[in-house]
Amino acid sequence: MAKQGSKEKKGYPELKEVIKATCKIRVGPGKETLTEGNCLWALKTIDFIFEDLKTEPWTITKMYTVWDRLKGLTPEETSKREFASLQATLACIMCSQMGMKPETVQAAKGIISMKEGLQENKEAKGEKVEQLYPNLEKHREVYPIVNLQAGGRSWKAVESVVFQQLQTVAMQHGLVSEDFERQLAYYATTWTSKDILEVLVMMPGNRAQKELIQGKLNEEAERWVRQNPPGPNVLTVDQIMGVGQTNQQASQANMDQARQICLQWVITALRSVRHMSHRPGNPMLVKQKNTESYEDFIARLLEAIDAEPVMDPIKTYLKVTLSYTNASTDCQKQMDRTLGTRVQQATVEEKMQACRDVGSEGFKMQLLAQALRPQGKAGHKGVNQKCYNCGKPGHLARQCRQGIICHHCGKRGHMQKDCRQKKQQGNNRRGPRVVPSAPPML
């Protein structure tokens, strides 16, 4: 039993490196990462659900098979949260198995969903394309749109190597950096509009920056509508953004202009947000000082946001978000205590009401009192605990004045481990040794 228990403890040795990489993925922006226990829970749960796949090794093919089967299941109302956690954890493991490094669980789910849609489209049309163009494999590259010798075009998903490289650049230099802009402009020349926008959404970056980028894209779309009235040969905003098109349709030659315009809009949005970030008075750089009251900080922040040339929904989002993230540590703690879980969605007025006393003498005295106050039951432990030697409360056994009492024979002057009566008994009453082992999983 002992050997069997130690063998089971190893878990899934073929996924050791995959689980290690998965443990670097965060549950959400700024939140904790997944743990090895989360991964093992997901893998063992899947083994119990699909017993016919339990003996097969954990390859990417098996993971996709499990993913497809999970989509066909309908969990009970009480198990929906656990089922969603199971799918999310599996998506993270699949990304790690493919060598991708998503920053959050949501990004991993987006990657798998995108690849799944691309795979379905590829399987539906793959057989027909291979029959028409038998030499297709000779012309495949890292680009989604492939020109064929026999004429026409074929679409291929963005390579994971390219996606991972863009993700690394975004994490190291920033989403709106010049390095990321150059990399995106280089690879996206042969991407469809849908590919460009989906890759941009799944890149790691500041939420406020992503909202500003989306706002700039909306401004470009509105400008296009004003300058290009509807006509027979005029591209619509939906065509430029790839809305309502299949990947095969978006890869054809008649959509080249739309793809170029979409890429130009994205680059313009990245540059606008980058210039905004480096310009004096940038709202994201307005942070509360140590000696500054929350009201004065909010006044500076709102003035900077109102001066930005962005739409009202973006301004509202920046006010709600930055009024918490750019506040001081004391104000953030006070908002957490007062507003609880809805602190991120609370209005600026509610946050000002919560932080009105931060920095005052009364607030400082309250913090000092909390720091000196005993924490929970631990503060009263020494008062209520009884002495194991004499049985009286108010002191510990090592502080007892009545001397040491043997808990085996009841006499004073020695401890239980030195008791002679205990040594004389030997091991006659000792039973067989019990080896601890993990219980069987039901």
Swiss-Prot record:
GO BP terms: viral budding via host ESCRT complex; viral translational frameshifting
Database matches in InterPro entries: Gag_p24_C, Primate_lentivir_Gag_pol-like, Retrov_capsid_C, Retrov_capsid_N, Znf_CCHC, Znf_CCHC_sf
Motif extent (PTAP/PSAP motif): 436-439
Molecular functions per Gene Ontology: nucleic acid binding; zinc ion binding
Matching SMART domains: ZnF_C2HC
Alphabetical keyword list: Capsid protein, Host-virus interaction, Metal-binding, Repeat, Viral budding, Viral budding via the host ESCRT complexes, Viral release from host cell, Virion, Zinc, Zinc-finger
Entries under PANTHER family matching the protein: ENDOGENOUS RETROVIRUS GROUP K MEMBER 24 GAG POLYPROTEIN-RELATED (PTHR40389), IGE-BINDING PROTEIN (PTHR40389:SF3)
The family this protein is said to belong to: Belongs to the Ovine/caprine lentivirus group gag polyprotein family.
Protein name, per record: Gag polyprotein
Species whose genome carries this gene: Maedi visna virus (strain 1514 / clone LV1-1KS2) (MVV)
Gene name tied to this protein: gag
